[in-house]
């Protein structure tokens, strides 16, 4: 019996000892158990990618810069390159530059990327708002006392472009539903079109917002795609194919005019009305600042005598420029800024000078040149500026809603209470008052 009790006692002792080895003592609430100093970490967590933010960027220059940086490629010192001010254009680094001149663009991309990343970090590389500032700082780091002069709003907008290329169009540049097709940049560089792309596109967006917010878009497809084919064939004429809305552009000031045609102003029975409406929205309301700037440049050149020699030799075009300047400024027109430029005064001056000189190309003549067929529409004897001046007169006296109603119905007399000839007589009386 004694042996049996001893055996049981031994078993109880072993059980107690084993329990003390395997059970964790009770710990205070919310307290983690201690870990052994000799425990082994078996985690397989992947280290964070320092360039993760940048890999998702669709900007081409960032891709080139990142690839060089990851491969520890030594960047070029571009002080001599940028000492030539003509090369400042390469610092824009918009996507189409890598098609235009990859050899010069890639080293710039690599150097700028390394400068911004090293000094400001990954987020700064993507910061469009401060990018102009960073580019100026980069130039200073080269020992150059020069600022990067691109306007921040232009920089941000053009950096948002979608770019592609094909065998027909070397440069296809899109901003949302607006696309420009260039076979080439004619004799110039991409930079000369940056202002055009910015002001033309933002002006179109502003014009559409204006139509929509003022309930003037009845019958107009303001949500359509706008495709501009930049033909530059030397004719100076623009054309919108009414069947599909594609626009063929020779004059950069006419993109908004043609967009109004593409949206639905296509009836030509009263050609003066359709063309006048397109110019009213596309030019007169000032959505594209470059149009005012181009007119002001002509007036300033006339003021400074640049056209005197040609005008004195009998060149009709230069005589017209000088007379428009005299008419516009005599009636109080200003040419000191786009904000004070008076489109209405300028258009009326242009119409008067044309009528007085009796030297202008009519709507009918232009229609025949573009469409290869005669035009017998009402108002085809007017010029574009004369038709626009007439529409402006009607807007002042009847309102734009009535003008659009007349276009939609093509019933001029019912809408205005007068026919075309009577309205034209009233307009001429106003013009020469």
PLM-predicted stretches and their roles:
Residues 56-64, 102-110, 118, 122, ...:
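Solvent-exposed, acidic/flexible segments
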Residues 1-7:
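Positively charged n-region of N-terminal signal peptides that target proteins for export
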Residues 43-80, 240-347:
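Zinc-dependent metallopeptidase catalytic helix centered on the HExxH motif
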Residues 18-20:
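C-terminal motif of bacterial Sec signal peptides marking the signal peptidase cleavage site
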Residues 66, 70-71, 84-137, 307-421:
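Active-site-proximal alpha-helical
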Residues 22-27, 33, 37, 41-46, ...:
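Beta/coil-rich, acidic/histidine-enriched accessory regions frequently appended to metallopeptidases
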Residues 52-55, 71-76, 114-122, 130-134, ...:
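Sec-exported extracytoplasmic/periplasmic mature domains
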Residues 43-59, 174-270:
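Juxtacatalytic substrate-recognition/specificity segment
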